[in-house]
Amino acid sequence: MFVVTNRITVKKGFAEKMAPRFTKGGKIEALQGFHKIEVWKVTRDHENEDMYVNTWWETEKDFEAWTKSDAFKEAHQNRDKTSSESSPVISSEIVKATVLSTLN
């Protein structure tokens, strides 16, 4: 199992507003190797909020295929559009990991 986490720091009050954007569904569910998406709000003591958008894939190759797909482009096409409001996103970092052990 391969997990990709997008660690996103947003302005306070925006994590819960933004979370549904990542789990509204779309073409990603039909892609080979896709398992699920979870969005976590990370508890920290500072002025911003941290979200971890976690996607589970069968293999890293499956994830890489997603990033090169038309479905990926469609899912990300509106995020760079200019609006009258400034973006609530302060920073983001992608972390890739292979699951080595699990207890259910």
UniProtKB/Swiss-Prot annotation:
UniProt EC number: 1.14.99.48
Domain of life: Bacteria
Residues holding Fe cation: 6
Pfam families cross-referenced by the UniProt entry: ABM
Gene3D superfamilies for this protein: 3.30.70.100
Transmembrane feature ranges: none
MF term (GO), any: iron ion binding
Gene Ontology BP, a term: iron import into cell
Binding site for heme: 76
GO CC annotations on file: cytoplasm
Annotated family: Belongs to the antibiotic biosynthesis monooxygenase family. Heme-degrading monooxygenase IsdG subfamily.
HAMAP family in UniProt: Heme_degrading_monooxygenase
Protein name per UniProt: Heme oxygenase (staphylobilin-producing)
Organism of this sequence: Staphylococcus haemolyticus (strain JCSC1435)
